[in-house]
Design a protein with these regions (language model features):
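Short glycine/proline-rich turn/loop motifs
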Residues: 94-96, 158-162, 242-245
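Conserved S-adenosyl-L-methionine
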Residues: 171-283
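C-terminal edge-of-domain segments
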Residues: 137-153
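SAM-dependent Rossmann-like transferase core, predominantly class I methyltransferases
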Residues: 148-184
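Short loop/turn segments at secondary-structure transitions that flank enzyme active sites
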Residues: 41, 97, 145, 154, ...
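Non-catalytic nucleic-acid substrate-recognition regions in nucleic-acid-modifying enzymes
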Residues: 1-135
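Beta-rich nucleic-acid/ligand-interaction surfaces
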Residues: 132-139, 198-199
Length: 284
Protein backbone atom coordinates (compact mmCIF):
# COMPACT_ATOMS: atom_id res chain seq x y z
CA UNK A 1 0.00 0.00 0.00
CA UNK A 2 2.01 3.01 -1.21
CA UNK A 3 1.63 6.37 0.49
CA UNK A 4 3.31 9.76 0.68
CA UNK A 5 6.67 9.94 2.45
CA UNK A 6 6.23 10.46 6.17
CA UNK A 7 2.73 9.00 6.23
CA UNK A 8 3.78 5.36 6.67
CA UNK A 9 3.20 5.24 10.43
CA UNK A 10 -0.23 6.83 10.17
CA UNK A 11 -1.16 4.40 7.39
CA UNK A 12 -0.03 1.41 9.46
CA UNK A 13 -2.23 2.60 12.33
CA UNK A 14 -5.13 3.05 9.92
CA UNK A 15 -4.73 -0.42 8.39
CA UNK A 16 -4.60 -1.91 11.89
CA UNK A 17 -7.84 -0.12 12.77
CA UNK A 18 -9.49 -1.39 9.57
CA UNK A 19 -8.28 -5.01 9.66
CA UNK A 20 -6.94 -5.73 13.14
CA UNK A 21 -3.62 -6.90 11.64
CA UNK A 22 -0.52 -6.61 13.86
CA UNK A 23 3.07 -7.81 14.18
CA UNK A 24 4.65 -9.53 11.19
CA UNK A 25 1.34 -9.31 9.34
CA UNK A 26 1.64 -5.52 9.19
CA UNK A 27 5.00 -3.97 8.34
CA UNK A 28 6.00 -0.40 7.57
CA UNK A 29 8.49 0.29 4.79
CA UNK A 30 9.80 3.30 2.95
CA UNK A 31 6.92 4.90 1.09
CA UNK A 32 4.27 2.40 2.08
CA UNK A 33 2.91 -0.39 4.25
CA UNK A 34 2.91 -4.14 3.61
CA UNK A 35 0.29 -6.47 5.04
CA UNK A 36 -0.33 -10.20 4.97
CA UNK A 37 -4.07 -10.02 4.57
CA UNK A 38 -7.12 -11.72 3.08
CA UNK A 39 -8.98 -10.77 -0.09
CA UNK A 40 -11.76 -9.47 2.13
CA UNK A 41 -9.24 -7.26 3.93
CA UNK A 42 -8.03 -5.89 0.58
CA UNK A 43 -11.57 -4.83 -0.29
CA UNK A 44 -12.11 -3.38 3.17
CA UNK A 45 -8.89 -1.33 2.99
CA UNK A 46 -9.91 0.05 -0.41
CA UNK A 47 -13.25 1.06 1.05
CA UNK A 48 -12.01 2.58 4.31
CA UNK A 49 -8.45 3.84 3.86
CA UNK A 50 -7.98 7.59 3.58
CA UNK A 51 -4.19 7.50 3.41
CA UNK A 52 -2.99 4.92 0.90
CA UNK A 53 -2.76 5.70 -2.79
CA UNK A 54 -3.84 2.22 -3.87
CA UNK A 55 -3.89 -1.40 -2.71
CA UNK A 56 -1.62 -3.79 -4.61
CA UNK A 57 -1.49 -7.59 -4.28
CA UNK A 58 2.07 -8.89 -4.53
CA UNK A 59 2.22 -11.90 -6.87
CA UNK A 60 5.93 -12.64 -7.22
CA UNK A 61 9.45 -11.52 -6.32
CA UNK A 62 12.18 -12.77 -8.67
CA UNK A 63 15.88 -12.17 -9.22
CA UNK A 64 16.81 -10.99 -12.72
CA UNK A 65 19.77 -9.99 -14.85
CA UNK A 66 18.20 -8.81 -18.09
CA UNK A 67 14.90 -8.23 -19.87
CA UNK A 68 14.57 -11.90 -20.81
CA UNK A 69 14.53 -12.75 -17.11
CA UNK A 70 11.64 -10.30 -16.69
CA UNK A 71 9.73 -12.14 -19.42
CA UNK A 72 10.38 -15.49 -17.74
CA UNK A 73 9.31 -14.23 -14.32
CA UNK A 74 6.07 -12.72 -15.64
CA UNK A 75 5.26 -15.83 -17.67
CA UNK A 76 5.32 -17.94 -14.49
CA UNK A 77 2.57 -15.93 -12.77
CA UNK A 78 -0.92 -17.48 -13.06
CA UNK A 79 -2.58 -14.39 -14.54
CA UNK A 80 -5.50 -16.52 -15.71
CA UNK A 81 -6.79 -16.86 -12.14
CA UNK A 82 -7.04 -13.07 -11.87
CA UNK A 83 -8.68 -11.99 -15.14
CA UNK A 84 -9.82 -13.27 -18.53
CA UNK A 85 -8.47 -12.76 -22.08
CA UNK A 86 -11.62 -10.77 -22.86
CA UNK A 87 -10.42 -8.01 -20.52
CA UNK A 88 -7.84 -5.34 -21.26
CA UNK A 89 -4.72 -4.73 -19.20
CA UNK A 90 -1.87 -2.27 -18.75
CA UNK A 91 1.66 -2.58 -17.38
CA UNK A 92 2.98 0.19 -15.12
CA UNK A 93 6.65 -0.09 -14.23
CA UNK A 94 8.80 1.74 -11.69
CA UNK A 95 12.48 1.35 -10.88
CA UNK A 96 14.93 1.98 -8.08
CA UNK A 97 18.55 2.09 -9.31
CA UNK A 98 17.75 -0.40 -12.06
CA UNK A 99 20.52 -1.37 -14.52
CA UNK A 100 17.97 -1.73 -17.33
CA UNK A 101 18.55 0.66 -20.21
CA UNK A 102 14.85 1.12 -21.07
CA UNK A 103 11.90 0.76 -18.73
CA UNK A 104 9.57 0.95 -21.72
CA UNK A 105 11.24 -2.12 -23.23
CA UNK A 106 11.08 -3.87 -19.86
CA UNK A 107 7.35 -3.16 -19.66
CA UNK A 108 6.94 -4.49 -23.21
CA UNK A 109 8.64 -7.78 -22.26
CA UNK A 110 6.34 -8.17 -19.25
CA UNK A 111 3.32 -7.36 -21.41
CA UNK A 112 4.37 -10.01 -23.95
CA UNK A 113 4.79 -12.57 -21.17
CA UNK A 114 1.30 -11.92 -19.83
CA UNK A 115 -0.25 -12.13 -23.30
CA UNK A 116 1.71 -15.26 -24.24
CA UNK A 117 0.72 -16.93 -20.97
CA UNK A 118 -2.95 -16.35 -21.80
CA UNK A 119 -2.51 -17.69 -25.32
CA UNK A 120 -0.92 -20.85 -23.91
CA UNK A 121 -3.47 -21.34 -21.12
CA UNK A 122 -6.70 -19.93 -22.60
CA UNK A 123 -6.11 -19.95 -26.36
CA UNK A 124 -6.28 -16.18 -26.85
CA UNK A 125 -4.43 -13.03 -25.83
CA UNK A 126 -5.95 -10.10 -23.94
CA UNK A 127 -5.59 -6.64 -25.46
CA UNK A 128 -3.69 -3.72 -23.98
CA UNK A 129 -5.47 -0.48 -23.09
CA UNK A 130 -3.14 2.19 -21.76
CA UNK A 131 -5.95 4.65 -20.97
CA UNK A 132 -8.83 2.78 -19.31
CA UNK A 133 -7.66 -0.81 -18.73
CA UNK A 134 -9.80 -3.33 -16.91
CA UNK A 135 -6.72 -4.60 -15.08
CA UNK A 136 -3.56 -2.79 -13.99
CA UNK A 137 -0.36 -4.75 -13.43
CA UNK A 138 2.47 -3.04 -11.55
CA UNK A 139 6.12 -4.01 -11.86
CA UNK A 140 8.91 -2.67 -9.66
CA UNK A 141 12.56 -3.35 -10.43
CA UNK A 142 15.53 -2.84 -8.13
CA UNK A 143 19.15 -3.57 -9.07
CA UNK A 144 18.52 -7.29 -8.51
CA UNK A 145 14.81 -8.10 -8.15
CA UNK A 146 11.52 -7.80 -10.03
CA UNK A 147 8.31 -7.58 -8.01
CA UNK A 148 4.97 -8.02 -9.77
CA UNK A 149 1.66 -6.80 -8.38
CA UNK A 150 -1.94 -6.73 -9.49
CA UNK A 151 -3.87 -3.60 -8.60
CA UNK A 152 -7.15 -3.83 -6.70
CA UNK A 153 -7.96 -0.12 -6.61
CA UNK A 154 -8.30 1.02 -10.22
CA UNK A 155 -8.29 4.80 -10.13
CA UNK A 156 -6.04 6.22 -7.36
CA UNK A 157 -7.78 6.20 -4.00
CA UNK A 158 -7.57 9.98 -3.59
CA UNK A 159 -10.38 10.05 -6.15
CA UNK A 160 -13.25 9.65 -3.69
CA UNK A 161 -15.99 10.33 -6.22
CA UNK A 162 -17.36 13.58 -4.79
CA UNK A 163 -14.97 16.25 -6.07
CA UNK A 164 -16.45 17.77 -9.22
CA UNK A 165 -15.77 21.42 -8.45
CA UNK A 166 -12.13 22.28 -7.84
CA UNK A 167 -9.78 25.23 -7.94
CA UNK A 168 -6.50 25.75 -9.77
CA UNK A 169 -4.35 23.79 -7.31
CA UNK A 170 -6.59 21.28 -5.51
CA UNK A 171 -5.28 19.40 -2.50
CA UNK A 172 -5.44 15.62 -2.93
CA UNK A 173 -7.82 13.95 -0.53
CA UNK A 174 -5.15 11.50 0.67
CA UNK A 175 -2.83 14.40 1.53
CA UNK A 176 -5.63 16.25 3.32
CA UNK A 177 -6.32 13.12 5.37
CA UNK A 178 -2.60 12.82 6.16
CA UNK A 179 -2.53 16.43 7.37
CA UNK A 180 -5.49 15.71 9.65
CA UNK A 181 -3.81 12.56 10.99
CA UNK A 182 -0.55 14.43 11.61
CA UNK A 183 -2.39 17.19 13.47
CA UNK A 184 -3.57 14.71 16.09
CA UNK A 185 -7.22 15.73 15.64
CA UNK A 186 -9.41 12.97 17.06
CA UNK A 187 -12.87 14.12 15.88
CA UNK A 188 -13.94 15.16 19.38
CA UNK A 189 -13.07 18.87 19.15
CA UNK A 190 -14.01 21.49 16.54
CA UNK A 191 -11.91 21.76 13.37
CA UNK A 192 -11.55 24.98 11.37
CA UNK A 193 -9.77 25.44 8.03
CA UNK A 194 -9.43 29.20 7.34
CA UNK A 195 -8.14 28.66 3.77
CA UNK A 196 -10.38 25.78 2.75
CA UNK A 197 -10.34 26.21 -1.03
CA UNK A 198 -12.74 23.69 -2.54
CA UNK A 199 -13.22 22.11 0.89
CA UNK A 200 -10.96 19.07 0.88
CA UNK A 201 -9.80 19.23 4.50
CA UNK A 202 -13.20 20.09 6.05
CA UNK A 203 -14.91 17.41 3.96
CA UNK A 204 -12.40 14.74 4.94
CA UNK A 205 -12.75 15.80 8.58
CA UNK A 206 -16.53 15.80 8.40
CA UNK A 207 -16.62 12.29 6.97
CA UNK A 208 -14.29 11.14 9.75
CA UNK A 209 -16.53 12.80 12.35
CA UNK A 210 -19.55 11.00 10.87
CA UNK A 211 -17.88 7.61 10.36
CA UNK A 212 -18.41 7.77 6.58
CA UNK A 213 -16.14 5.44 4.60
CA UNK A 214 -14.23 7.39 1.90
CA UNK A 215 -14.77 4.78 -0.83
CA UNK A 216 -18.55 4.55 -0.77
CA UNK A 217 -19.03 6.75 -3.84
CA UNK A 218 -16.59 5.14 -6.28
CA UNK A 219 -15.80 1.92 -8.12
CA UNK A 220 -12.71 -0.24 -7.64
CA UNK A 221 -10.42 -2.35 -9.77
CA UNK A 222 -11.13 -5.50 -7.76
CA UNK A 223 -14.69 -5.48 -9.08
CA UNK A 224 -13.28 -6.64 -12.44
CA UNK A 225 -11.02 -9.37 -11.05
CA UNK A 226 -12.05 -13.03 -10.97
CA UNK A 227 -11.87 -13.48 -7.15
CA UNK A 228 -14.51 -10.76 -6.76
CA UNK A 229 -17.78 -11.87 -5.15
CA UNK A 230 -20.46 -9.20 -5.29
CA UNK A 231 -22.42 -10.49 -2.30
CA UNK A 232 -19.32 -10.21 -0.09
CA UNK A 233 -18.68 -6.67 -1.35
CA UNK A 234 -22.28 -5.61 -0.78
CA UNK A 235 -21.98 -6.93 2.76
CA UNK A 236 -18.93 -4.74 3.37
CA UNK A 237 -20.77 -1.71 2.00
CA UNK A 238 -23.76 -2.41 4.24
CA UNK A 239 -21.44 -2.86 7.22
CA UNK A 240 -19.80 0.51 6.46
CA UNK A 241 -23.15 2.30 6.19
CA UNK A 242 -24.27 0.78 9.49
CA UNK A 243 -21.32 2.47 11.20
CA UNK A 244 -22.25 5.98 10.06
CA UNK A 245 -23.41 8.30 12.84
CA UNK A 246 -24.13 11.89 13.77
CA UNK A 247 -21.03 14.15 13.76
CA UNK A 248 -18.90 13.99 16.88
CA UNK A 249 -17.51 17.52 16.40
CA UNK A 250 -18.41 20.70 14.47
CA UNK A 251 -16.42 21.46 11.31
CA UNK A 252 -15.83 24.92 9.84
CA UNK A 253 -14.25 26.21 6.65
CA UNK A 254 -13.73 29.61 5.07
CA UNK A 255 -11.96 31.13 2.09
CA UNK A 256 -11.33 34.65 0.85
CA UNK A 257 -12.65 33.62 -2.59
CA UNK A 258 -16.43 33.28 -2.49
CA UNK A 259 -16.24 31.19 -5.69
CA UNK A 260 -14.21 28.58 -3.80
CA UNK A 261 -16.69 28.59 -0.93
CA UNK A 262 -19.41 27.81 -3.45
CA UNK A 263 -17.29 24.94 -4.81
CA UNK A 264 -16.72 23.66 -1.27
CA UNK A 265 -20.42 23.69 -0.45
CA UNK A 266 -21.28 21.74 -3.59
CA UNK A 267 -18.51 19.21 -2.97
CA UNK A 268 -19.69 18.77 0.63
CA UNK A 269 -23.20 18.07 -0.60
CA UNK A 270 -21.95 15.34 -2.93
CA UNK A 271 -19.82 13.92 -0.10
CA UNK A 272 -22.88 13.64 2.13
CA UNK A 273 -21.70 16.15 4.74
CA UNK A 274 -23.31 19.42 3.66
CA UNK A 275 -25.19 19.66 6.95
CA UNK A 276 -22.07 18.99 9.00
CA UNK A 277 -19.76 21.78 7.79
CA UNK A 278 -20.34 25.51 8.19
CA UNK A 279 -18.70 27.38 5.31
CA UNK A 280 -18.32 31.14 4.97
CA UNK A 281 -16.50 33.57 2.71
CA UNK A 282 -14.08 36.16 4.01
CA UNK A 283 -10.51 36.95 4.93
CA UNK A 284 -8.90 34.51 7.36
Amino acid sequence: MPCAAGVEGFLADEVHAITGLTGNDLMTGRGGVMARASWRDAMRINLHSRLTQRVLVQLSVTDYRNENDLYQAASEVAWEIWFTPKQTFKIDITAQHSPLTSLNFAALKIKDAVADRFRAKRGERPNVDTTWPDVRIYAHVTPETLTLYIDTSGEPLFKRGWRTDKGDAPLKETLAAAMIAASGWDATVPLYDPCCGSGTIPIEAAQIACGIAPGLQRRFGFEKLLPFQNHVWQGLIEEARDHEHEPTAPIFGSDVAFRMVDFAERNAERAGVSGVIEFRGGDA
